[in-house]
Amino acid sequence: MSEAYKQAGVDIDAGNEAVERMKKHVKRTFRPEVMTDLGGFGALFRLDTKKYEKPILVSGTDGVGTKLKLAFAMDKHDTIGIDAVAMCVNDVVVQGAEPLFFLDYLAVDKVIPEKIEAIVKGIAEGCSQSGCSLIGGETAEMPGMYAEGEYDIAGFTVGVVDESKMITGASVAAGDVLIGLASSGVHSNGFSLVRKVLLADKGMSLHDHVDVLGKKLGEELLTPTRIYVKQVLSVLESHEVKALVHITGGGFTENIPRVLPEGMQAVINVGSWPVLPIFELVQGAGNISYPDMYKTFNMGIGMMLVVKPEDAVSVMEKLQELGEQAYLIGNIQAGERKVVYNGVEW
């Protein structure tokens, strides 16, 4: 039966080899609460409810979009898994939750054990960076569904927060301060536009060395999404944070209002942090307007914290102790629930 299945395009033996290869990477992410090994039908996790008065589970799921196209073109697969984890756990920590475990879904045209191992190694690295366990996953070999050498990846995470410590943004008020944490680059959003402008329209190659970037274009674009979980949780232990914003698809313009109460707007002081060269390259090459840039990209800020003005200095100092590049980038004022930009001609 397995030989007939192999002739149909599904190689069970290759799948088994891939599982063996990934085991060492997966196991290094296991927290003490993990109760199962690889291979079970369902993964078990013992939540210590005694640590919480009213534990609330927080879930998130996401993928990495067309950044995958760059991994295919560069034949580099060991960091895209970090992106998959980052997109999920950064969303969960925004609620004040600690990510507990992560599951992945990987769909491929053909199982190549070495490639699967590289992808899962990246997922495990992302889990290690965020302190959550890679508790399970699915690798689906589906001949005829994907072009040769291509795959898709998605992730799912569950975290926990005590109800009294949930962060909702409900208390955000005029005078509060916005602190931005530096991104590592484009992260995992806006790549359809990046690819159109730089590759299709300008004819650049991913293997081109770009002086303003100091590296090959493909290396810059595949830089993994930063994971902010441990830093944010550390700040939450000692400081009140009214709201957190993960800058993903929709950029500043779409994401910041998601945490603002009615009657409050965010004022962003453009120029109060360094915009990364990759964004200047894309904007210049595509003649893209500032409104489009700030509605598409993170512009060098991957996570934002909203704090009381009297807490801003101590929060900044804490973040710097944790190795973060943190910037005071704006404030909250009364007005229509939206983002207002100072310092740039719109």
UniProtKB/Swiss-Prot annotation:
GO molecular function, one term: phosphoribosylamine-glycine ligase activity
Documented EC number(s): 6.3.3.1
Gene3D superfamilies, per database record: PurM-like C-terminal domain, PurM-like, N-terminal domain
InterPro entries assigned to the protein according to its UniProt record, in alphabetical order: PurM-like_C_dom (IPR010918), PurM-like_C_sf (IPR036676), PurM-like_N (IPR016188), PurM-like_N_sf (IPR036921), PurM_cligase (IPR004733)
GO BP of this protein: 'de novo' IMP biosynthetic process; adenine biosynthetic process
Main localisation: cytoplasm
Family the UniProt entry places it in: Belongs to the AIR synthase family.
Keywords for the protein's UniProt record, in alphabetical order: ATP-binding, Cytoplasm, Ligase, Nucleotide-binding, Purine biosynthesis
Pathway involvement of the protein, from the record: Purine metabolism; IMP biosynthesis via de novo pathway; 5-amino-1-(5-phospho-D-ribosyl)imidazole from N(2)-formyl-N(1)-(5-phospho-D-ribosyl)glycinamide: step 2/2
Compartments, as annotated in UniProt: Cytoplasm
Listed Pfam families: AIRS, AIRS_C
Superkingdom, taxonomy of origin: Bacteria
Reactions listed under catalytic activity: 2-formamido-N(1)-(5-O-phospho-beta-D-ribosyl)acetamidine + ATP = 5-amino-1-(5-phospho-beta-D-ribosyl)imidazole + ADP + phosphate + H(+)
HAMAP family with a match to the protein in the record: AIRS
Protein known as: Phosphoribosylformylglycinamidine cyclo-ligase
